[in-house]
Structure formats: structure tokens, C-alpha cells
């Protein structure tokens, strides 16, 4: 089995449009959450959201390519530019090699609704436009990026709810590890428009702390009252160690463990057993003692039951070993399909720069979070290995273990 390394990363989120901006936001404990006036006008119970600026692609892509990109595809494109740049992968390399793409996405709401509005108003399907179909499919990101970047390897979308981005990395890891692919672009993206979360809002799943947006997302805190939706794009370049060395690439980190499970239980209420099995599988796959995992970026979305059960699962698996545990969603909100990929990048940036961002708004633990080592202030510490959890509706669970690259690991 081959070693799987990370050679490039790109991030476009509510706390920064590139790695440098995001690293600074994490270090400062800066929130990217605010109020969306459009949601207030539409009658949403909560107008809270991660605030992500749409990129201007006019100088980067021709009109035809822009016409096929949905909002989340724009974010993914920007993240991919940064990831390929860092990996030192240019167009010539992409044309000459079979680079694959596995990307997490589980909705494309705005193009679907906009197309239906046109059909109902105009009574003419031709008025929808040629780009609509390519924007509205769940595979919109992989189909567009594969064309834009000439990707010739594996090409499909991972649709695994809020674990989509994490599973995309995990599947890329398995394919490269087994020798079926040498290099894969993977990640996740999430649209931020109001249409994408309307039904979520109707379920009462969102925090309603609109008077203090930066205090609304409060993972593990006893007073949490729901999640804050968010989005953006996160891309990573995974490749075999041999491929990276052959190219002379700088190796950033190594993926050493992937765990997954299904709860086989309630469609929206998480349990303890599924996450516990995912965690344990990742640790077994990595083949390392628990003590080597020094930090966990939890899935914790700031929901009462979800955070409670994840805390219980972590406590069961790790026992007396108490690594630092935080949820970067306290700064970003829940980036949903993107979160599993973005949180690997957030964790890497912290690991690479010797700090752990604070779990914002963690003021009082509940019965389960009291069992964990959750810092409410920034911790400046060196660590070599982290674990990232991502869970989703339908009971899909993913856990990834990443460590600093060392030649003799």
C-alpha cells in the first residue's frame, strides 16, 4: 500500500479568501457570521449565515465556462486555483497526466428554483438557458472543474450530506493508497444563497441569536440553540508519495487514517454508536496509539443532540487521553457539504503554525462536553497529528487522521 500525501490546499470561506487570510482569522478567533437581509425579507426564522463574497471570474474564465458554474462551483474554482498553485501543478502537467477529481456537493438549489421560476413565468422551457442544467445537477462542481482544468482521471461527486467533503478526501485516499490513481483533486463546496437552507430553517434547526451573530454558533456550550449555515469552497491535492517526489513537490502533510460508518438509525438525529465506530476505524487504519492524536476538530455544529452525542463518542474512544477538542464552526458556522474538507485545511493551518484556534462561545459545558478538553481561548502549542470528524443526515459518518509529513514515518 502506498503513502498518501497532501501537496496543495485552497480555501475560500467566510473567514478568508485564501490560506493566509484564513490562518489570520483562525489565530485571531475572528467570526465570519452575520445577517443576510434577504432571509429577513423572505420570512426566515433566522437570517444568520456565514458571509461569503461571490468572486468576480470575468478576468479568469470565459463567458461559456462561467455560464455553467453554479455559486458553489465559483467557490470551488477559486479554491482549486490556490491548491494547484501551491502543489505546483500547471496546465501542461494536467494535460499530460491523469489527475482525478472527487468533490463533495449535495445540493444546487438556486439554479433549480430560478429555472422553475422562469418556466412558470414565461411558459417556455427554452428561456431557461443552456447553462442551467450544468448548474443544477449535484455533480455541477466535478463536471465543470474537470472541463476547466482538463482532469482525466476519476471523476464523480460525493453526495454524503454534511460529510461529503470528508468522504471525498477519504475516497481519494483509498484510491491512491491502493494504486488505482496517482493524483486526485478533492474537496467540498457549499452554496450560501437562502434557497439552499429554506427547509432547514423551517425545521427550526438554526440559531436565532440574531442580536449577536458572532455569538450564535456555540459548539459544545450548554446554551447552544442551533447551527448557523455557511459555505464556500475547499480544495486539496492528494497524491502518492512517489508521485510527489517524482514531481519535486513540497509535501505538506500525510493522510494516515480514514474511518466511516452509518448509524442505521434516525434520519436526522445522530447517535453515539455510529460516530464511535467511525472514530475507531480511523484510528485502527492509522495504526497509531491514541496518545499521538493531539487535536480533534469536531463535527459539532452547535445543535443540542448532535454535540452531546459526539462528545460522548469522543470520550468513549479516547478515555483518559484528553486531546484538545474544538469545533472551528464556532467561527465559520456550518459549511455543510464543504465542512469536511475545509476543516482539514483549518486544522492543518493551525498545526503548521503552532496554535489551536479557540472554541468560541464555549462558556458552560454540558454533561458530555465537560468530559472533553475544550479550550475557549487560543492555545499556542506544537502538534503533529490531528483528527477531523464529519457527520451527516442519514447517519453518514467520516473521520480523517492527518499528520505532519516526515520521510521516515
Question: Which ranges hold each PLM region?
Answer:
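Conserved beta-ketoacyl condensing-enzyme motif
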Residues: 6, 27-160, 189-197, 290-305
Amino acid at each position: 500500500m502506498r503513502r498518501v500525501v497532501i501537496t496543495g490546499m485552497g480555501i475560500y470561506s467566510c473567514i478568508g479568501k485564501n490560506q493566509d487570510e484564513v490562518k489570520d482569522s483562525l489565530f485571531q478567533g475572528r467570526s465570519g457570521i452575520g445577517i443576510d437581509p434577504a432571509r429577513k425579507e423572505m420570512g426566515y426564522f433566522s437570517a444568520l449565515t456565514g458571509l461569503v463574497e461571490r468572486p468576480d471570474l470575468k478576468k479568469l474564465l470565459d463567458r461559456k465556462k462561467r455560464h455553467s458554474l453554479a455559486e458553489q462551483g465559483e467557490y470551488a474554482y477559486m479554491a482549486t486555483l490556490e491548491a494547484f498553485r501551491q502543489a505546483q501543478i500547471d496546465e501542461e502537467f494536467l494535460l499530460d497526466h491523469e489527475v482525478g477529481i472527487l468533490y463533495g456537493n449535495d445540493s444546487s438549489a438556486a439554479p433549480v428554483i430560478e429555472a422553475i421560476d422562469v418556466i412558470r413565468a414565461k411558459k417556455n422551457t427554452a428561456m431557461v438557458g443552456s447553462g442551467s442544467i450544468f448548474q443544477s445537477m449535484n455533480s455541477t462542481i466535478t463536471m465543470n472543474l474537470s472541463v476547466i482544468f482538463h482532469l482525466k482521471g476519476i471523476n464523480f461527486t460525493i453526495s454524503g450530506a454534511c460529510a461529503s467533503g470528508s468522504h471525498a478526501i477519504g475516497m481519494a485516499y483509498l484510491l491512491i493508497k491502493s494504486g488505482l490513481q496517482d493524483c486526485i483533486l478533492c474537496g467540498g463546496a457549499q452554496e450560501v444563497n437562502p434557497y439552499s437552507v429554506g427547509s432547514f430553517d423551517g425545521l427550526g434547526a438554526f440559531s436565532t441569536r440574531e442580536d449577536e451573530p458572532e455569538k450564535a454558533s456555540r459548539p459544545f456550550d450548554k446554551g447552544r440553540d442551533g447551527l448557523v449555515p455557511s459555505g464556500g469552497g475547499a480544495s486539496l491535492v492528494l497524491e502518492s508519495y512517489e508521485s510527489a517526489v517524482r514531481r519535486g513537490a513540497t509535501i505538506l502533510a500525510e493522510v494516515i487514517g480514514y474511518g466511516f460508518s452509518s448509524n442505521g438509525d434516525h434520519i436526522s438525529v445522530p447517535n453515539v454508536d455510529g460516530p464511535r465506530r467511525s472514530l475507531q476505524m480511523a484510528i485502527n487504519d492509522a495504526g497509531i496509539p491514541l496518545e499521538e492524536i493531539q487535536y480533534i476538530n469536531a463535527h459539532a455544529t452547535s445543535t443540542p443532540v448532535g454535540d452531546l452525542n459526539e462528545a460522548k463518542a469522543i470520550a468513549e474512544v479516547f478515555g483518559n487521553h484528553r486531546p484538545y477538542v474544538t469545533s472551528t464552526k464556532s467561527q465559520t458556522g456550518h459549511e455543510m457539504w464543504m465542512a469536511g474538507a475545509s476543516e482539514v485545511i483549518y486544522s492543518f493551518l493551525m498545526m503548521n503554525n503552532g496554535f489551536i484556534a479557540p472554541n468560541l462561545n464555549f462558556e458552560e459545558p454540558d454533561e458530555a462536553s465537560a468530559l472533553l478538553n475544550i479550550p475557549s481561548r487560543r492555545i499556542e502549542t506544537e502538534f503533529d497529528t490531528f483528527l477531523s470528524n464529519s457527520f451527516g443526515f442519514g447517519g453518514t459518518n467520516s473521520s480523517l487522521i492527518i499528520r505532519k509529513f516526515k520521510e521516515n514515518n
